[in-house]
Amino acid sequence: MHQHMLGPSTSLGGTNNSALQSSVLSEGVLLSHSQPTREEIKKNFETREGVYRSVPSAEFSRPRPLPQYHMPPGIASAAASQIAAAGSTVRVSFLNGAEKSVESPEAVAPTSSTYEHHKNEPNGARIDMVDEAQADKICFNVGKELYVFSYRGTQTETDLSRPIDKRVYKGTSPTYHAFNQESAKNGSCQLLIGFTLGQLQIIDPLEKSSSSPFSRLYNEDRYIEKTSVTCIRWLPGDSNIFLASYVSGNLYVYDQRISAASSNNNGSSQPPPWTIHKEGDKFAIHTWKGKVQRNPVTRWQIGEGSIHQFSFSGSDGKMMATVSHDGFLRIFNYHAQELLAVMKSYFGGLLTLSWSPDAKLIATGGEDDLLTVYSVAEKRVVCRGQAHKSWVSQVKFDPYLCTTEEDLENNGIAMTSTFDDVAKDFSIRSGPVPSTSADLNSGVMNATSTFSRCSLASFNTINGAPAGNSVRYRIGSVGHDTFLCLWDITEDMLNQGNIRRHRNSTIIAPMTTLEVQTNSLVGRLEDLQEVSPGGAGVNASSDSQSITNNHTTPRPEKQKKKKFTKRLGFSKFTSGSSSATSNPVGGHKIGTLMNGASVNSESSKKQNPGLISQISCCNETRMLGSKFCPGIRDVPMIEPLMCKKVSHDRLTVLEFREDCVVTACQEGYICTWGRPGRYQPKRDCINSPGTASPESGQKPSGSTSAMTSSYGYGSDALNGVPPSRSSSTYSNSEQQLRSPNITSPSYRVSAASTSVYHRPTYAWQNAN
């Protein structure tokens, strides 16, 4: 039987003994796959504010089953993992519906019951169409498929057989997507999608009545860019501008008001006629030659390697931060097109970033397995966090658990600086960083709702009195190790002069011996220039003076060498040679740090000034121990408040909602975790006939007559009947995305194939 399943055994030596060994080996492989060993994952986890509970009725997954081919459970599970790994990264995006009160959960309950009562009516009729239009929307991609569903947080009752929109692409896969929050209205929205072959598409997944559905293609012929899309964003405050980053390290700015077909090659094999508009340290901005407006309007070349992610600060979009494969976090003034600050990862590339609600901090994560918190105003690393055992794939600030001005005033605590101070500092850039000792003005964290003030009134207090280490920020992180970690950033951690051990932090002990210089941070930064807009060096004496004031011990005349150990390797930062350059603008010498030592050479004055612009501050930040990449002992190493295994496959998504937390893994399962006091499990509705969650073993009831999209770039099916491939409803601009070498015809999934894929049930799911 095993030979029939795995194929005939191959004789290595031509004897029966070899054939027997091969058969035994095949059987052993089969048994190892059929009995996989998996760690238990958690259905709930506890923090200081309460218990977060899994919401089985609000789970999403791919409705389509795996290929119809009978395999043992272990083999099937392994095949599912391979199929998921072969596709693009699973991403989740949300469209916020109409504003609704969240003061009392009872106000939302009738909505859920009304939907539950009418969702099984013939032909999927729903009486409360107004409520359906006002509900939030969730979009996620799994492999070559894209789905859009209604989402109500902890009140969601998932029916995977009836998506709002569903698309399958042939020859390419969605890699990233984002809703246009600025232009969304009842019954209409814009969803921007990026693909592995570099194309971009804007669709309206809510439009069902029009005979010519809205669809717009950018970079259709791959003339502008041929690599995969890594991240896309809509410009805050502008419903027409969106940006897309690529594996090539390019970031393009598009304008919907300009024709999407204006950048076609028209049969020419020549590259696009870009011209440099502005250039700085490791970045350049290009525009089109001539006065004719084209899409994309500008191109940013940033760093070396792929731009993994970028994000804007707050709702005004004044600053833009990027993280790249070269390990750099770069912060730009987007409108002025100036580089404001940089930071280097401890090791490897950076994969993700997140702005704090007040735009004063940035959290990053990547291949060094560390969480890094960076202060934008002070341009320094606040702390690092170690808990993950693999790459950190997503970090997010929780806007509902960040302390507001009102909370701090009630607790008798004053904050340090405002976003206006940060923006003013970056817009002027004509002097040293202003002092951050001013009191807080009004309007700091508008993103924080009443949830943190009402439900978590005692979050920063002990028996009604202000806590000593007041929690200012809550950060979440997920990684390839399948763990979800929550971190608290306290007031003490934000104090630059306070390097003592915190209650929730510790300095990691060394493991491997490495001989480096352990002189003070002042000595390491003395001969380094500061990052300035456009790459020009400025006098850093003010920063050096401020750092000197924070250290009471004088710099020793002779540096002493000590041996300490490290947990993470950084051999790429060390070298057997040393060099130095001089700054032609400010006249300061730039000592390159090699093995922790600062070296100044008189011969550097004779270097070509043209080379200095190429090996300026970005090369300096590669050196471990500098201001831009502090050593392991230079900043506090904190521990997480909570770290739990919540998935069997690597996690790729983390989103904080008002009543829940959303995670997603590469297998394509989107899970909802109800916040404390916002969800109570109900056993009678978890496995209800109308609920088709991935955890349940029952098939959904009701009709499967939901309209199915034409897959590729085609329109949605009309009257529930998908058009044929030869239908005239497909226009030339709605052709399917595919590789030029692919000749197979497009296909679409019929209604019969919308059956629910049954996720294997594990022991933890039946636990109380």
UniProtKB/Swiss-Prot annotation:
One of its GO terms (biological process) is positive regulation of gene expression. PROSITE patterns: WD_REPEATS_1 (PS00678), WD_REPEATS_2 (PS50082), WD_REPEATS_REGION (PS50294). PANTHER family: AT02583P, WD REPEAT PROTEIN. WD repeats lie at residues 224-264, 302-342, 345-384, 454-497, 646-683. Residues 570-582, 724-733 have a biased composition (Low complexity). It comes from the Eukaryota. Keywords: Repeat, Ubl conjugation pathway, WD repeat. Residues 103-122, 531-608, 684-749 are annotated as: Disordered. The keyword Cell division does not apply. This is WD repeat-containing protein 20 homolog. Expressed in several neurons in the head and tail. Interacts with usp-46; the interaction increases the catalytic activity of usp-46 in the presence of wdr-48. Together with wdr-48, binds to and stimulates the activity of the deubiquitinating enzyme usp-46, leading to deubiquitination and stabilization of the glr-1 glutamate receptor. Disruption phenotype: 25% decrease in glr-1 expression in the ventral nerve cord. Changed locomotion behavior with mutants displaying decreased reversal frequencies consistent with decreased glutamergic signaling. Residues 539-553, 595-608, 688-712, 734-749 have a biased composition (Polar residues). SUPFAM superfamilies: WD40 repeat-like. Signal peptide: none annotated.
